[in-house]
Amino acid sequence: MIRVRIDIESEEINNSNTVIASLLTLEVLFGQKEKRKMTFDSRKKQIIRIGRIKSDEIDFNFNDEDVSRKQCMIIFEDNNWYIVDGNGIQKSSNGTWFYPEKYYNINEGLIIRIGTTLFECNYLQDN
């Protein structure tokens, strides 16, 4: 089983809760030979593609037979990160396990199963 942590850090303007940028960190905690950590900035990338294949189309890939070639996407829209199964048009062949909504808002502590991989979502706190 692969365990992945997702950390999100948001920058705010004048305490108005207006998000100008959000950093999303995906970290493999358990299950692969090498530990990996990738951070995505919403100002540069609004769609993160997750899957099994290594290609220019996949931003975060896993060597897991139970993960589809194009498993899911994490999308930054309306100042929030969302996860959606498949490539946005077609669902993944192996499924992404979360509530049965098309787009699911990534909240603090959310756990998502993709194949045998577990994702845990947490927000980074600015100190």
Show the residue positions of the predicted features.
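Intrinsically disordered, low-complexity acidic Ser/Thr-rich regulatory segments
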Residues: 1-63, 122-127
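Forkhead-associated
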Residues: 41-115
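Short, charged beta-turn/beta-strand-edge "cap" motif at the junction between a beta-strand
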Residues: 117-121
